[in-house]
Regions:
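Short gly/ser/thr-rich secondary-structure transition/capping motifs
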Residues: 22-24, 63-70, 162-169, 183-188, ...
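Conserved beta-strand elements of the Class I
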Residues: 40, 54, 64, 117-121, ...
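Conserved residues at the C-terminal ends of beta-strands
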Residues: 2, 85, 146, 206, ...
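C-terminal regulatory/interaction regions
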Residues: 169-284
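Binuclear metal-ion centers of metallo-dependent hydrolases, dominated by the metallo-beta-lactamase
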Residues: 29, 76-78, 90-178, 246-284
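Short, well-ordered alpha-helical microsegments
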Residues: 50, 72-73, 127-131, 193, ...
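His/Asp/Glu-rich metal-coordinating catalytic cores
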Residues: 1-121, 125, 136-137
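A short helix-to-beta-strand connector/capping loop
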Residues: 18-22, 34-37, 163-166, 180-181, ...
Length: 284
């Protein structure tokens, strides 16, 4: 894993002991030898620290694991065998929008800041991506967040993200900003959506929206289709560019692995199988 991944994992679960001597972190592009194999991490455009893994054996066979990625800014690893994510592996999972969703999101937040605090709900990693988007767009209002989101955000800053003024929602500054409905952006995990900021402008970000880049889901609440995963077309394109002769689709986290394998065989004529055969758990 990368150092950033290790640090994020520890921030999310302090029971993990990832700084033990047996745990080795790697930099992107640095190859290490393990027995007769060589292992290299390749950057993936997903969240901070995300990486693809390339393993080369003594015979020159290249096996790659894509991890989670967005294809636009992820270098494709050419390989003989590819293990590819399948979060949006169904042909129904396509985002063919004619607008820049990131620009749309920034504009929506800027407009709603005129009315006070804006609440943004999403998942760890994606929340920090939105923070960086706003800072890059010169949105300078304070960012307010609960403890866990704050800890993840501080890790992101340690690894190069520049996120400006941050306040804990439980500190005096945070309480004054939220309690007084002053201009700020409050970042909360999606699990908090049911009970936080109910009387304010609210924006939820999710990759599971394919019909519209933005739609209203409540009186002052909107869903924005911002994803940190490739859609179906992006997954197919990655497989095509990888020139893999054999593909294994990840069928553990979501149930689209088998569908994606079938579509790879049909569209690309490449041998593909979903593993495990029975899906594991479903994640958002």
């Amino acid at each position: 894993m990368t150092k950033a991944t290790r640090d994020l994992a520890e921030a999310l679960d302090d029971s993990l002991k990832l700084r033990d001597a047996v745990i080795e972190t790697l930099e992107y592009g640095k190859t290490v030898r393990y027995g007769e194999e060589q292992i290299t991490l390749v950057k993936a455009d997903h969240i901070l620290g995300a990486a693809q893994v390339l393993v080369e054996d003594a015979g020159g066979i290249r096996v790659a694991y894509s991890g989670d990625f967005r294809i636009d800014d992820t270098p494709v690893v050419e390989c003989d065998v590819l293990v590819v994510e399948a979060t949006y592996g169904s042909p129904s999972c396509r985002r063919s929008f004619d607008v820049d969703v990131r620009e749309l999101l920034v504009t929506m937040i800027e407009k709603r800041l005129r009315g006070g605090a804006v609440y943004v709900f999403g998942y760890h990693g994606k929340l920090q991506e939105i923070m960086q988007l706003l800072r890059n767009a010169d949105v300078s209002v304070p960012f307010v967040m609960p403890q866990r989101v704050y800890e993840v955000t501080k890790v992101c800053e340690q690894h190069g993200m520049q996120l400006g003024c941050l306040s804990l929602s439980t500190d005096m500054d945070g309480r004054e900003l939220l309690g007084g409905n002053l201009p700020c952006v409050a970042f909360y995990h999606m699990n908090s959506r049911g009970y936080v900021g109910l009387n304010n402008a609210r924006i939820c970000v999710s990759g599971w929206e394919f019909n519209s880049p933005c739609r209203q889901i409540g009186d002052r609440e909107y869903l924005v289709a911002l994803s940190d995963h490739s859609d179906f077309d992006g997954l197919i394109e990655y497989v095509k560019r990888s020139r893999a002769k054999k593909v294994i689709t990840d069928n553990y986290r979501v149930s689209h692995g088998a569908v994606l394998a079938k579509e790879i065989r049909k569209r690309l004529g490449v041998s593909a199988v979903a593993m495990p055969r029975t899906p594991g758990q479903t994640t958002l």
